A protein has these predicted regions:
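Flexible, processing/modification-adjacent segments and terminal tails
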Residues: 17-35, 41, 50-52, 84-159, ...
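A short, sequence-level motif marking secondary-structure junctions
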Residues: 58-62, 84-86, 103-107, 191-194, ...
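Gly/Pro-enriched, hydrophobic low-complexity segments
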Residues: 140-235
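Mid-chain, structured segments of secreted extracytoplasmic proteins
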Residues: 60-102
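N-terminal, post-signal-peptide region of Sec/Tat-exported proteins
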Residues: 39-67, 71-75
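Bacterial N-terminal signal peptides
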Residues: 1-9
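Sec/Tat signal peptide C-region and signal peptidase I cleavage site
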Residues: 10-16
Length: 246
């Protein structure tokens, strides 16, 4: 009996490790370096016509820390800082940073959390749901593992995520993103492409399930390993130095 129990525990732990590895592998297709500069272009479409476009430079580093620099003329001088579960918006003429949440919208369906957070493994605990054959954006049928991700941090953008990853490659295909209320907030679809000869997520399409005529596409135009000095991750420093060339 004891041997049976120990074997069951071992098998359960092995499955949990496998699922955690799947999430980390999916993360690597989105961000393959712990400290990086990500140039993101966000485009809002309505009835397949471009409505608005914005550009952001995102500086990420370990321990769930990100600095987002707003680069478009209409948002010039604005910055957003994420330090773990805490988020601040820094306005160019403000004397103090403004506390915000990761769900605050930037453009269309793209929220602060969608731009600043490029990994799942630091914020979620995953379990295996099963396998499904689904149709990709490219109209191809792909066998996937369906994973259920539950938030483990207060600053996670979504309480729950249903994530589908390619059985063979581990590439993320799509995700259903749920609010703390249990409501489906939006669906994300991931576009495959190559960056420096490697398969990567080159764009994420966010679809509003309530307003299907609208969609928001976040393009990851470039990702390069860069480490900023610690001072840039201080809300007080960002407030005092509104004109940073980043």
């Amino acid at each position: 009996m004891l041997l049976f129990v120990l074997n069951a525990i071992f098998v359960g732990q092995s499955i949990a490790n496998d699922v955690a590895d799947m999430v980390k592998r999916a993360d690597e297709y989105r961000l393959d370096s712990s400290s990086s500069k990500v140039v993101s272009k966000v485009t809002l479409f309505e009835h397949d016509q471009i409505d608005k476009t914005r550009e952001y430079h995102v500086y990420t580093r370990p321990n769930r820390e990100s600095l987002v620099v707003f680069k478009s003329a209409v948002e010039a001088g604005q910055k957003m800082l994420m330090l773990g579960d805490n988020y601040w918006l820094v306005m160019p003429k403000s004397r103090r940073p403004i506390r915000i949440t990761p769900m605050q919208k930037l453009l269309g369906e793209a929220s602060i959390g969608d731009i600043s957070t490029l990994t799942w493994s630091d914020d979620y605990q995953a379990t295996m749901v099963g396998t499904e054959s689904i149709i990709t954006q490219e109209k191809l049928s792909v066998d996937t593992h369906k994973l259920n991700l539950i938030a483990t941090t207060k600053g996670a953008s979504y309480q729950r995520i249903d994530l589908w990853v390619d059985v063979i490659k581990g590439f993320p295909i799509k995700a259903d993103l749920y609010l703390r209320s249990g409501k489906l907030a939006k669906q994300a679809q991931f576009t495959q492409g190559e960056r420096e000869g490697r398969l990567q997520v080159v764009a994420m399409t966010l679809i509003d399930k309530i307003q299907p005529a609208k969609k928001t596409i976040i393009e990851y135009q470039s990702i390069m390993p860069i480490t900023l000095e610690d001072k840039y991750y201080s809300p007080a420093y960002l407030t005092r130095n509104s004109k940073l060339d980043l």
